[in-house]
């Protein structure tokens, strides 16, 4: 059967198109059986059709190579799948299949592959069992042989999904997690991440080798200059600024000063400056074709770039919330973590550890920006800050908590061998008071004494920044680790 590609309608995030993940599918069998058992081909083919229907429920584009039962047909399917440039391949074993039928996929397709063995029956009807019935339920018979041939061909043994058809919930969750992991990897494919400025002075954990980053994730790291952003800001018209101000007023609650003496009233000119820079920042991203941006500009006092670099928070928050993650202090690795979290459906805000609360057994996590307002608990607030602690200039900060419920923290750091590694933990966002300091803060519990969790987290070697997202995503991150080859440390 000749391959074809099922073009599904592309879904979009607010503001920016989500790149569609291409999922390959092939169903394999043994042609000799079909000469011996009438109707068996049709019955086994339906297994691939059923799996394709399952894939259509997910946000992906399906490239279905059909039913393959000879090595020669596998060669044809491989060439077609290579043309489609798929991100992941599911191989449905419909019955016993000689490993020669699967070997071409192992040898010639440089993409993660998953072996599927879904047995129709929970058990054979032993008193009425026939050879035909056994062949219809021999989905796992060849799996050891097929898995072994990957190793003999110098490839990693593929992960396997083995279940009876009645285990529908398990099958769906496994498929969904693998597709989410493939989507996270595809988020970097043929993409460009911007790097504006330099890392915050002295933050060794922020320093990243751009070539090592490309080796790990695939995306190109493009060096940008603050003067380009300055030029774009000068080109913003008064009408564009007014429209952005109206947009900001619609999204945010503008707050008066709090008890913190660093807070101040948000004046019209403050809002106008942030709005103008927001328009320019969006244009910078679009003109350079960026999927994410890491930025930091120290700025000398009263330098003409100081107001520009100090008033990025509204713009970077709007971009992050629309699907283009921005990471402050030029944290390239956390920009990647935010992009992964976005692809997994968790949103992804820029965060670090703030003070903990032993009485409530929570830790506050947040930052002065950038943030993802799509996962906030209620309307986000704006506060004017007379100064940023540790940074130059003054400007408007964003303040909110993540909505209550499950959360995931994802940090990406570098190990002693210079390799990227992920550190992740799952917790719970809880309601309650947060400081009114123009920063985000979320009260997070981890189901154990908070000081013990923090010890384990710090001892795992993360960067001090991380992506904070809603939902529990470690199961999908495990699969992303398999696909990407980036190790994962789970902190519990």
Can you annotate each of these PLM segments?
Residues 389-492:
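Extended hydrophobic packing segments that form well-structured cores
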Residues 40-56:
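Short catalytic helix/loop segments, enriched in acidic residues and glycine
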Residues 86-95, 114-116, 291-295:
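Periplasmic-binding protein-like
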Residues 318-435:
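C-terminal catalytic subdomain
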Residues 20-23, 59, 122-259:
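Cap/lid and interdomain-hinge subdomains that line or gate substrate/regulatory clefts
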Residues 3-10, 14:
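Short, positively charged and aromatic/hydrophobic N-terminal segments
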Residues 104-129, 134-142, 316-329:
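Short, acidic/small-residue loops that bind anionic groups at enzyme active sites
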Residues 242-335, 342-343:
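Long, internal scaffold/assembly segments composed of regular secondary structure
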